[in-house]
Amino acid sequence: MIVALKFILVAFVSYFIGTINFSKILSWYVRHKDITKIGSGNPGTMNMLRSYGFGLALLTFVAEVAKAGLTCLIFKLCFPEFGQLIYFFAGLFIMIGYIFPVWSKFKGGKGVACFAGVFLFSNLWYVALAWFAICFVLLIFIDYGCIISFTYIGGLAIGYTIYVWLEGVAYAWAITVIIWVLFALMIFKHHGNIKRLFNHTENKIDFKGKLKKVFCHKKGEQIIEEECVDQKPETEIVIEPKPTNQQTDSEVQKPQDEETPKQD
């Protein structure tokens, strides 16, 4: 009974933490716009990237990763007797809360950043981080974000499943089920992207172009600053006023008066 109550508590708290959507928060308070009404309409990292650029997208991703990962880690520390099981159980309900938030009529984001956060804070964080770096590089060459998302979440799901069985992790079967339920949720939320890929109508993100804008903008600001510092002040040109006709007549008349001798 106590065990059941612990899992119910974790599920309840994790769900409501998952409903916090940082793309909506940042879009509204930074740009004063509703992210669900621009771009693809999806309140997630990729739509933030398409709509606002690299900066806000990165901030959204980091916030979602931290939200999911830290929540799972806290519950694992609170209930250490369940090990990785309680960790991924919390991650599952964070994902459910993010994808089906009660506050938005159960219409939320696709959960890729939350999924990444669950694995980036796990005991295989270094593998998840290395795989993220590889997928980040691939994103420069592949303009379809959903393909990179499938590559990342699929690689993590396969890799962690192999790990729990090879290492004999406790509750390996339950952890495996949770991981693949998470993966199934990802596929379900991306069904529209899959259809558009086959119809050749999927939106491109132009990640390379957005990166160029970021670095070119910074480089341009640096060049302007250097030009302002190195720029020498221009020498002032003083223009003397021309004498008026009255001044010239008096100046001419004065020496003539001096030359004429006085008469007694």
Protein language model regions, located:
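Long, low-complexity, intrinsically disordered segments
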Residues: 233-264
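Interfacial segments of multi-pass membrane proteins
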Residues: 49-52, 75-79, 93, 112-142, ...
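Short, non-helical or kinked segments that cap or interrupt transmembrane helices
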Residues: 33-44, 102-116, 144-155
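Helix-coil boundary and interhelical linker segments in multi-pass alpha-helical membrane proteins
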Residues: 1-9, 70-89, 120-127, 162-178
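Cytosolic, membrane-interface loops and tails of multi-pass inner-membrane proteins
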Residues: 24-55, 108, 195-214
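Multi-pass membrane catalytic core of lipid/isoprenoid biosynthesis enzymes
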Residues: 50-76
